[in-house]
């Protein structure tokens, strides 16, 4: 028998090849990542070691200087050290910032205190901060040391400058940037520092000088406050450059807060845009008196689309005045002057029409609430002339809840829809507050209003209430409000200023969330809270302002007037009728009338 032997050679299949390559790549990537990880650790460690060595080097320089020379060039205290410098070590670029402060130790009294320390610069704090611009994973380092004199103190020949920074609510602002210059000494003094957690910066042992210290306080996304030079244009600044007096403390307060935005549009009364409308925008804050010098006073112009956005606006009360050659202002929405709160966005519509030739703008306000008054009948007459109209709806609201709950629509303004039973509405009449059980107020309660009908599709502007100031002991917030709107009076979804159910209006004079625009009916839900049982917040009135399309609230204009003296007759049910004379001698005249309830 013949035996045949066959050799069979097998190779790798495609699947086996792919799997093998994948495994190989995983191993290679793992090895590479491990190598890079070790490399990065070594790299980061090396940069940190260099930074620590650099800090020690700077501290040794400070330690080896005479005490009188431990200070900053052009700084306070004055000395040999440089405030900011870039140092290179092994291809690393380090930014080194040195800050030195005189410290007034309370052990022997403080300047201006009891006892009064006539030599307040007891010791110095040296702070070295280092950062690296081209290092990977580098965390900035800060090292602080204390330097004290060897000898006994002697009476100081300098003074002290204490700077406090607050926000619009009076709260201290920490980490505010403070820039100080004194160019009346040689070398000039230049200090850049920040406020502490209490919003304070203390400069001890400052060289005396009259109106010598220029101070500017800033913070990212905040407004700016500063001292001003005495000039011919501003002979009496409200906050002149600081004066330092021998062995005295000069204290200055600065107020800064978050910047806001104005969205301004120039339109007709049918909401058609009017391009390139010129106007003057003025704030109410003063930087000088006798004569008054405004902090903000600028001329502006809207775009070709009739729009203008002004960012970086400081909180203030602003007035818009038309200076356009072809158009007059016939109304604004909201009513001017308008206030903008810190960190907010305010939409303003300036309603204009062509000059023809003279225009009278009549503004009617409620004498109690101070808000624009709707449905006022206005008649303007002169010999051979008569015209009449009605002011646009301005506000709806409530000043009495004494007739209780159970009313779905606000036909009786002394009633409301419902409450949780913890609201007192009759003692006193005209106010709502937390219910009192025996001698204790309940901790919280809420009330839902009847529905208010604005009469047409509306743009809702602001929610307001009084009193604004509530008992401090009740906590904060102690008054909260949510708003619900719809177009048919059906479903009510209550929301806050960001359009969600988790937020509340907690400050009076708040802008209503724009998502409510386009609706007709409104309800509010009032929440009262107290942190104690001995006091309660109270509300005497709640009201909201709105407009229908581009009809300005509480305003009416008359155009095509000739020069002369006109008679105004104004009447509205529930108010004292008024007759007023108005001279019209220029192209645009504004007359504000306050209506007093009967």
Indicate where each model-derived feature is located:
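N-terminal leader/signal peptides at the extreme start of proteins
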Residues: 1-12
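Aliphatic-rich helix starts adjacent to a transmembrane/signal segment
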Residues: 12-56
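Low-complexity, Gly/Pro-rich coil/beta segments used as flexible assembly/activation regions
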Residues: 45-171, 266
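A short, amphipathic beta-strand motif
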Residues: 159-167, 254, 260-268, 358-366, ...
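Short, acidic Ser/Thr/Gly-rich low-complexity loop/linker segments typical of extracellular
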Residues: 183-205, 285-309, 383-392, 548-557
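Short Pro-Gly-centered beta-turn/loop motif in secreted/extracellular proteins
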Residues: 197-215, 219-221, 298-326, 552-567, ...
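Structured interaction patches on ligand/partner-binding surfaces of diverse proteins
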Residues: 218-251, 300-301, 320-355, 549, ...
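Beta-strand-rich ligand- or partner-binding modules
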Residues: 390-549
């Amino acid at each position: 028998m013949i035996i045949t032997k066959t050799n069979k050679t097998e190779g790798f299949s495609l699947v086996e090849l792919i799997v093998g390559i994948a495994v190989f790549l995983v191993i290679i990537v793992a090895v590479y990542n491990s190598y890079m990880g070790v490399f990065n650790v070594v790299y980061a460690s090396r940069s940190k070691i260099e930074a620590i060595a650099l800090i020690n080097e700077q501290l040794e320089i400070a330690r080896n200087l005479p005490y009188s020379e431990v200070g900053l060039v052009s700084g306070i205290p004055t000395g040999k050290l440089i405030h900011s410098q870039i140092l290179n070590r092994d291809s690393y670029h380090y930014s080194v910032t040195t800050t030195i402060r005189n410290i007034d130790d309370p052990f022997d009294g403080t300047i201006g205190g009891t006892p009064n320390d006539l030599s307040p610069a007891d010791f110095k704090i040296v702070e070295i901060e280092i950062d690296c611009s081209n290092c990977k994973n580098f965390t900035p380092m800060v090292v602080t040391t204390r330097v004290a004199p060897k000898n006994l103190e002697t009476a100081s020949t300098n003074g002290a400058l204490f700077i406090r920074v607050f926000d619009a609510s009076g709260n201290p602002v920490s980490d505010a940037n403070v820039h100080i210059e004194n160019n009346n000494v040689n070398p000039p003094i230049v200090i850049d520092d920040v406020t502490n957690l209490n919003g304070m910066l203390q400069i001890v042992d400052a060289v005396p000088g009259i109106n010598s210290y220029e101070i500017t306080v800033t913070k990212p996304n905040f407004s700016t406050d500063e001292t001003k030079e005495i000039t011919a244009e501003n002979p009496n600044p409200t906050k002149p450059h600081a004066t330092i007096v021998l062995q005295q403390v000069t204290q200055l307060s600065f107020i800064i807060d978050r910047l806001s935005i104005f969205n301004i549009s120039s339109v007709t009364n049918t909401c058609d845009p009017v391009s390139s409308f010129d106007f003057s925008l003025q704030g109410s804050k003063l930087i000088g008196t006798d004569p008054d010098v405004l902090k903000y006073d600028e001329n502006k112009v809207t775009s070709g689309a009739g729009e203008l956005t002004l960012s970086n606006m400081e909180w203030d009360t602003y007035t818009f005045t038309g200076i356009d050659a072809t158009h007059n202002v016939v109304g604004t929405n909201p009513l001017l002057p308008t206030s903008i709160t810190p960190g907010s966005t305010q939409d303003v519509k300036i309603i204009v029409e062509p000059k023809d030739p003279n225009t009278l703008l009549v503004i009617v306000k409620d004498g109690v609430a101070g808000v624009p008054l709707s449905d006022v009948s206005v008649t303007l007459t002169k010999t051979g002339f008569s015209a009449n109209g009605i002011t646009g709806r301005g506000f709806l609201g409530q000043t009495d809840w004494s007739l209780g709950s159970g009313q779905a629509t606000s036909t009786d303004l002394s009633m409301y829809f419902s409450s949780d039973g913890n609201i007192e509405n009759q003692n006193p009449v005209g106010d709502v507050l937390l219910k009192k059980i025996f001698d204790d107020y309940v901790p919280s309660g809420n009330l839902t209003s009847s529905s208010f009908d604005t009469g047409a599709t509306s743009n809702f502007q602001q929610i307001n209430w009084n009193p604004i100031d509530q008992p401090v002991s009740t906590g904060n917030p102690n008054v909260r409000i949510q708003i619900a709107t719809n177009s048919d009076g059906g479903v009510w979804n209550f929301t806050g200023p960001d359009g969600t159910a988790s937020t509340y209006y907690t400050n009076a004079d708040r802008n209503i969330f724009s998502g409510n625009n386009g609706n007709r009916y409104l309800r509010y839900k009032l929440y009262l809270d107290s942190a104690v049982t001995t006091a309660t917040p109270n509300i005497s009135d709640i009201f909201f302002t709105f407009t229908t399309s581009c009809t300005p609230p509480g305003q009416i204009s008359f155009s095509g007037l000739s020069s002369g003296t006109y008679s105004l007759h104004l009447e509205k049910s529930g108010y004292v009728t008024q007759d007023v004379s108005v001279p019209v001698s220029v192209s645009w005249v504004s007359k504000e009338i306050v209506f007093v309830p009967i």
